[in-house]
Curated annotation (Swiss-Prot):
GO BP term (any one): rRNA base methylation
GO molecular function: 4 iron, 4 sulfur cluster binding; metal ion binding; rRNA (uridine-C5-)-methyltransferase activity
Protein name: Uncharacterized RNA methyltransferase bll2648
Highest taxon of source: Bacteria
Enzyme class: transferase
Active-site residues, as the UniProt record annotates them: C373 (nucleophile)
PROSITE patterns reported in the protein's UniProt record: SAM_MT_RNA_M5U, TRMA_1
InterPro entries on file: MeTrfase_TrmA_AS, NA-bd_OB-fold, SAM-dependent_MTases_sf, Small_mtfrase_dom, U5_MeTrfase_fam
Presence of keyword Lipid biosynthesis: no
4Fe-4S listed as a keyword: yes
Length: 415
């Protein structure tokens, strides 16, 4: 059923929000102040509508730069001018903190998209008539939109989509694929690092075919479910003055500019601390840079990432880095273990670090620097620190996921 709505504002998920009859209606790709024609969405989404036409457009509306926008589900916001978009992203942080009763300075949004995303996951699926499609998930669907170029990717990933198509063809033609095929491609110093997931065991002829593709596309490394198929060169990335060899599938900040921005903000807030603890350290984007001036102790549950950090820590000129695997959700560091550190940095995954935040709140650590990719769980954890006696010295929102609702942030707490 077609209806006409007036959009009040853009919500935290990037959808236009129409208010009326006591409920909110969400319309993707609509902007505040617009009058739009919409249709109901099939399925269990009574509060969502499909945008059919914009009758009265916002003066802030701009033309999307990608021909796949609105069909591909990768980007939610290419239709909004930069200035109001930046203000909206900052407002997500301000409003979420306010809901948690946190009143602090929130700096202007820092754009850290840089030259684009350095990692991408492509999906391989069979469509109608058993035709293979490789690309991104469609908006609000598990369908695959076949794509050969994505303008938000780092130019170093220019060959990623062609390589994914070339790998998907032998994987799907020479053996049955019982699960969706996912192909993660990461840009590294020595070429593309590719991990394939969803395929079954690889018979020798298929390994040969995949190795041929890897050579043709000059992949640095090809793995299947993290197991090595072929490596031409070590897939390394630069972190500070150090080259780190990435374990297959290990966490990596989305953009080079994003990592450098977050690391710089962390270092500024750590200040002159001599003993620093890095929690949820990953492969060491913060630890390796902090070790240029301070001794660092680092923990993460990913043993492969910790091993990569330990190897990189041997780089000449760094102060000692002691690192070991530890599940910080099940075994958070307790106040007695925290007492010798001048500063603690923690950068948990999206679920936040509630258990560790409780222990930090009971500690005497002078400075805590929080990095987060989820404003809601950050607000929860920040509330715990504040209730434990810490003051929050301000928040800096960082946008390395441009054209999406996702926003990262860095905050400093002190006693």
């Amino acid at each position: 059923m077609v209806e006409r709505l007036r959009i009040d504002h853009v919500g935290h998920r990037g959808d236009g929000v129409a208010l009326g009859a006591g409920e909110a209606i969400y319309v993707p790709y609509a902007l505040g102040g617009e009058t739009v024609e919409v249709d109901h969405v099939a399925g269990n989404h009574p509060d969502r509508r499909k945008l059919l036409a914009v009758d009265v457009a916002s003066p802030e509306r701009v033309a999307p730069f990608c021909p796949h926008f609105g069909i591909c589900g990768g980007c939610a916001i290419q239709h909004w001018a930069a200035e109001p978009y930046h203000a909206w992203k900052r407002s997500i942080v301000v409003e979420t903190l306010a809901q948690a009763g946190i009143d602090c300075e929130v700096a202007p949004l820092v754009d850290a998209h840089g030259v684009g995303r350095r990692r991408v996951t492509l999906h391989g699926r069979f469509g109608t008539h058993d035709i293979l499609k490789v690309g991104f998930s469609a908006a609000s669907s598990h369908d695959v939109i076949p794509i050969h170029r994505c303008p938000i990717l780092d130019p170093a990933l220019d060959g990623a989509l062609d390589a994914a198509w070339a790998l998907a063809e032998p994987l799907t033609s020479k053996m049955p694929v019982t699960k969706p095929l996912d192909i993660q491609v990461t840009a590294t110093t020595n070429g593309l690092d590719v991990d394939v997931r969803g395929s079954g065991p690889l018979p020798t002829p298929l390994v040969t075919a995949l190795s041929r593709v890897a050579e043709q596309h000059r992949l640095a490394r090809l793995t299947r479910h993290g197991e090595l198929v072929l490596q031409r060169l070590p897939p390394t990335v630069k972190m500070g003055r150090t080259e780190v060899t990435l374990p297959p599938g290990s966490f990596l900040q989305a953009t080079v500019a994003g990592e450098e921005t977050l690391a710089s903000l962390v270092a500024e807030r750590v200040g002159k601390a001599k003993e620093v603890l890095d929690l949820f350290c990953g492969v060491g984007p913060f630890a390796l840079r902090l070790a240029e001036k301070a001794r660092v102790t680092a923990y993460d549950s990913d043993a492969g990432a910790v091993a990569a950090l330990a190897k990189a820590a041997r780089t000449p000129g760094l102060k000692p880095i002691r690192c070991e695997p530890r599940d910080l959700f099940r075994r958070p560091l307790v106040p007695q273990e925290l007492r010798d550190f001048d500063a603690v940095v923690f950068d948990p995954p999206r679920q936040g670090a509630q258990a560790q935040a409780l222990k930090l709140a009971a500690s005497t650590v002078p400075v805590i620097v929080a990095v987060s990719c989820n404003v809601a769980t950050f607000a929860r954890d920040a509330r715990l620190l504040i209730d434990g006696g810490y003051r929050i010295d301000g928040v800096v929102p960082v946008d390395q996921f441009r054209h999406t609702p996702h926003v990262e942030l860095v905050a400093r707490f002190a006693r």
